[in-house]
Amino acid sequence: MKAFLLIFLFVSVSLGCSKDSTSLGEPVEIYLLKDFQLLTNKCQVDPSASSLQFTPTVANGEILEYSSSDYQFKLKATALERIKTLSDRTPFAVTVNKEVIYFGFFKPSFSSSSCDHSITMDLSWGQANRILMRLGYPGVPTGVTIEDERNNPRLLAALQNQGKLR
């Protein structure tokens, strides 16, 4: 009877245990925008007139690491394939626990249009499965200031708690 009770207890505890991703900290995700407006005469999302899509384009589990020195996310191949399908100037938001840290635009390196007032996302052609977050596209013009939240403390803390910060 004792053996049966011990086996039952062991099996119950084993089956009841599951990996809880929330115990690793707040999720970091990248969302496309369902609705948005631009600030007048700027390539910049108006935060007061935007909303996130229901599901993330890049889920927390698809972010493998983030390099704070060169602003690169390393993604699972499936997430990178979704990023590759985005059109030029597709707006996105980097979030922590579904709260927007910053907005930006997908700007592939072959784009002929500029985006002077926002963080931009591009594929990293030099390294596999990485996306770059840059200030402006093709760069920041003289006299333009972009609020740089790429290394926002809350974002870095969430990534650090998950062991994804490099």
Feature-to-residue mapping (PLM):
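Solvent-exposed, well-ordered amphipathic alpha-helical segments
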Residues: 2, 15, 75-76
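Sec-dependent N-terminal signal peptides
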Residues: 4-13
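A structural signal for conserved, well-ordered secondary-structure elements
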Residues: 23-166
